[in-house]
Swiss-Prot record:
ATP binds at residue 596. Catalyzes the attachment of isoleucine to tRNA(Ile). As IleRS can inadvertently accommodate and process structurally similar amino acids such as valine, to avoid such errors it has two additional distinct tRNA(Ile)-dependent editing activities. One activity is designated as 'pretransfer' editing and involves the hydrolysis of activated Val-AMP. The other activity is designated 'posttransfer' editing and involves deacylation of mischarged Val-tRNA(Ile). This is Isoleucine--tRNA ligase. Its cofactor is Zn(2+). The lineage of its organism: Bacteria, Bacillati, Bacillota, Bacilli, Bacillales.
Length: 921
């Protein structure tokens, strides 16, 4: 008889190798065929809503690791919520207007100057849709479950119409105004930029100290002094109209040789050192407030420079006397306005100096620094020129420096509802908690929001102008434009004359001849995406405002979190979200930013093609995403190893349940052995821990809990000793069916617990599980932890056993290394435990040699009675010897009962009985 044929070895069709790059696309096709998104929505209909609102990625180019991290985190949450009593719709979105798309077309050779704005915009829309399609397929490949057929896209007519409504509502409340004001201006984009569109990079600049002679000392100064200002932007000096000093600071009149200079007293030493003064002495001090309205002379133009008071003046750097050009700085503008200065801005859209800067007209601002400095030297006003490298704002798209420039722009008045904004921030739940402080400070400190852009590709600002120049924004015009956009899209604004965009018969007192013109600026793209709470959450039947959660990268505190908050509070008085969760950036394995120049860019597509989407998703679950995270081939290799462990666990469980019918073979909990019930306690602990971790968005805790359960609780303990019973006993042996009962519960629970993270693998496992009826694991709920009556007692006892078992395993390892035994089944062990452990061991009814995976187990005396040479551990001394007897051909146990049964002389007594009862006819 071939005894190996009498062993119940694992049997399953579930493949050992994942082969995810091939298998996942097939699974996704299956999901598409069964309409999994709709099925889940149908299955969860009527439950409370949980809305995670998707912040729209920009529709340009392939998705990068930041996109992958973001969408996968969202998918974890949505999938988990739909398995825990919620209906969790997920509507993906795309941000589709803005400069990058214009640039992409220009780079493709589109000659925009040879076509109308409307024609160019049509090409922009086509390009945007292509990009949406490209990114949609890549997001789907990640396994993200969403309403992919009905996303929201900011260029769609219905969306644009709602955005116009948001603008109109804000205008109606008086929050929208037109003003001349310095804004971030990008000469390379020829447009104003929002704060969210700038980034800081190092830049080399001229650092100059300039003397402004006093013209009128107002009886405070004698008239022969000179104010010293410091600037790193010499090109703004043609726009200088004043000097700001701090009212509370003390200023010193310093005599150096025959000259007298005015600087802040506390900067005396620094300035003296910088300007290499020798024999400098302070001849007089005055308070800043006394210098108000004194007048200096512009160094190279025949005009005055008024001395004004400003709280923005600091002693961090410079001289305490600040060069003030209202056309080129926020603080300068505010101070200048207070003192009635004009807003002089002699720089055009392209960054070129105009005729208002005589002697320098026609020069690009950056190229004007040198001739201006030379002019200062020529007139004797230049005291010092050096070069410094400092952090300077750049256009985030063109990567070129930007300037502050006063232009006529449309603004949303943040000041008008700042208090409500701050209240909304306080009412929101922030994860991490520092997010609240970050947004609070931004809202507290930010100026009014410049919402106009001088570009073509965007949503037009729906304003008309009367013949007398009055802007027209009324309910009637707003509703009419919104209706036109809903029907024709916003291109209609560029295709029709102003009169054809106004309601029929529209009149206005400022236009006696019935003539109107329309605004040509478009809205900041942050106004587009910032209106999604109205255009998507409020408008779609399957969603609601406020959303439960917004989840984006930490750069969105100044971006989408901020713009959405501003428009929502302005329109509804409330935040558009109940909670905000942010994640960090993806860095390479060494913690460096990914960049083409370093060549360290990791692309999601490559990972999915080589390893699979579930490996990428498992990586997302493994990292502390609230900070910056790292990815590299080595890191992915470790994650792939963990995946292999999880997959092998599934395969082992399935293989040993091949002959298990839950309806017939399940053993009641009360009839299970203690060790089996202990395993159920461990499973329930896992369920509780994993669900708590999902609830708090702590996916790394889910990852570690599942990995540890598979390796420590299952592989190293339960499954390890269970093999002897599963393979060796007869199919219906009560211990075997008891273990299978536990394995079945473990398998079903584990499959559900990993579903949000590993949906492809979970749905691959699901149909192999005996007795399941649902088409997909996604149509089930998370497992419930079942509290066993004796759970605490079981835990106390068996946790103690596990620590003692660790001691035994160490002793067996030593014996193996010393060649006392080959494998652990060759061993006979005698334990000399502590009193506590002895009591515990004596209370165990299970076969201890099976639990220790040895052939013979004996309980000796107490620990102190152990032989002197026996290795002693924390809980027991262990004597390991070679077991006596022969090795059974069938179960490999060493036994003295081999050959007792004449018909089966190579088998031990136990195996002979099993074979006779189950396999001998």
């Amino acid at each position: 008889m071939e005894y190996k044929n009498t062993l119940l070895m694992p049997k399953t069709e579930f493949p050992m190798r994942g082969n995810l790059p091939k298998r996942e696309p097939a699974m996704q096709e299956k999901w598409a065929e069964m309409n999994i998104y709709e099925k889940v929505q149908e299955h969860t209909k009527g439950r409370p809503l949980f809305v995670l609102h998707d912040g729209p990625p920009y529709a340009n180019g392939d998705i990068h690791m930041g996109h992958a991290l973001n969408k996968v985190l969202k998918d974890f949450i949505v999938r988990y919520k739909s398995m825990t009593g919620f209906c969790a719709p997920y509507v993906p979105g795309w941000d589709t207007h803005g400069l990058p798309i214009e640039q992409a077309l220009t780079n493709k050779g589109v000659k925009r100057k040879e076509m109308t704005v409307a024609e160019f915009r049509k090409l922009c829309a086509e390009y945007a849709y292509e990009q949406v399609e490209r990114q949609r397929e890549q997001f789907k490949r990640l396994g993200v479950r969403a309403d992919w057929d009905n996303p929201y896209i900011t260029l769609e007519p219905a969306y644009e119409a709602q955005q116009i409504k948001v603008f109109g509502d804000m205008a109606k409340k008086g929050y929208i105004y037109k003003g001349q004001k310095p804004v971030y201006w990008s000469p390379t984009s020829e447009s104003a930029l929002a704060e969210a569109e700038i980034e800081y990079q190092d830049k080399k600049s001229a650092s100059i100290y300039v003397a402004f002679p006093v013209k009128d000392g107002k009886n405070v100064l004698e008239g022969d002094e000179k104010y010293i200002i410091w600037t790193t932007t010499p090109w703004t000096l043609p726009a200088n109209l004043g000097i700001s000093v701090h009212p509370e600071l003390e200023y010193a009149i310093v005599k150096v040789n025959d000259e007298k200079y005015i600087i802040a007293s506390e900067l005396f030493e620094t300035v003296a050192k910088t300007l290499e003064w020798e024999n400098a002495e302070v001849v007089k001090t005055v308070k800043g407030s006394e210098l108000e309205y004194t007048v200096a002379k512009h160094p190279f133009y025949d005009r005055d420079s008024l001395v004004m008071l400003g709280d923005h003046v600091t002693t961090d750097a410079g001289t305490g006397c600040v060069h003030t050009a209202p056309g080129h700085g926020e603080d300068d503008f505010v101070v200048g306005k207070k003192y009635g200065l004009e807003v002089l801005c002699p720089v055009d859209d392209k960054g070129v100096l105009t005729e208002e800067a005589p002697g320098f007209e026609g020069l690009f601002y950056d190229k004007a620094n040198k001739p201006i400095t030379e002019k200062l030297e020529e007139v004797g006003a230049l005291l010092k020129l050096t070069f410094i490298t400092h952090s300077y704002p750049h256009d985030w798209r063109t990567k070129k420096p930007i300037i502050f420039r006063a232009t006529a722009q449309w603004f949303a008045s943040i000041e008008a509802f700042r208090k409500e904004l701050l209240e909304a921030v306080a009412e929101t739940k922030w994860v991490p908690a520092w997010g609240e402080t970050r947004l609070h400070n931004m809202v507290r400190d930010r100026g009014d929001w410049c919402i106009s852009r001088q570009r073509a590709w965007g949503v037009p600002i729906p304003v008309f102008y009367a013949e007398n120049g009055d802007p027209i924004i009324t309910d009637e015009t707003i509703n009419h434009v919104a209706d036109l956009f809903r029907e024709h899209g916003s291109n209609v604004w560029f295709e029709r004359e102003a009169k054809d965009l106004l309601p029929e018969g529209f009149t206005h007192p400022g236009s006696p001849n019935g003539e109107f013109r329309k605004e040509t600026d478009i809205m900041d793209v942050w106004f587009d995406s910032g209106s999604s709470h109205q255009a998507v959450l409020e408008e779609r039947d399957d969603l609601q405002r406020p959303a439960d959660l917004y989840l984006e990268g930490s750069d969105q505190y100044r971006g989408w979190f901020n713009s959405s908050l501003s428009t929502a509070v302005a329109v509804t008085g409330k935040a558009p979200y109940k909670g905000v969760l942010s994640h960090g950036f993806v860095l390479d394995g060494e913690g460096r930013k990914m960049s083409k120049s370093i060549g360290n860019i990791v692309v999601p597509k490559k990972i999915m093609d080589q390893l699979g989407g579930d490996i990428l998703r498992l990586w997302v679950s493994s990292v502390d995403y609230q900070s910056d995270v790292r990815i590299s081939d080595d890191i992915l290799k470790q994650v792939a190893e963990v995946y292999r462990k999880i997959r092998n666990t599934f395969r082992f469980l399935l293989g040993n349940l091949d002959d298990f019918k839950p309806s017939e073979n399940t053993v009641a909990v009360a009839e299970l052995r203690e060790v089996d019930r202990y395993m159920l306690v461990k499973l329930n602990d896992l369920i509780t821990k994993v669900k708590e971790a999902y609830e708090t968005y702590d996916f790394a805790a889910v990852y570690h809990a599942i990995h540890n359960f598979c390796t420590i609780d299952l592989s190293s303990f339960y499954l390890d000793f269970a093999k002897d019973i599963l393979y060796i006993e007869g199919a219906n042996h009560e211990d075997r069916r008891a273990i299978q009962t536990v394995l079945y519960d473990v398998l079903v629970a584990l499959t559900k617990l990993v579903t949000p993270i590993l949906p492809h693998t979970a749905d691959e496992v699901w149909p192999y599980i005996p007795g399941v009826t649902e088409e997909s694991v996604q149509l089930t709920d998370m497992p419930e932890a079942v509290q066993l009556d004796d759970a605490e007692a079981l835990k106390t006892k068996w946790d103690a056993f596990m620590t003692l078992r660790d001691d035994v395993l160490k002793a067996l390892e030593v014996a193996r290394n010393e060649k006392v035994i080959g494998k652990s089944l060759n061993a006979s062990i005698t334990l000399y435990p502590t009193a506590e452990m002895k009591t515990m061991l004596e209370s165990i009814n299970e076969d201890l040699k099976q639990l220790f995976i040895v052939s013979e187990y004996k309980l000796g005396g107490m620990m102190e009675e152990a032989p002197a040479d026996a290795p002693k551990y924390e809980h027991t001394a262990v004597v390991v010897a070679q077991a006596t007897g022969e090795t059974c051909e069938r179960c490999w146990v060493v036994s003295e009962t081999i050959g007792k049964d004449a018909e089966h002389e190579t088998l031990c007594e136990r195996c002979a009985t099993v074979v006779k009862e189950n396999y001998v006819k």
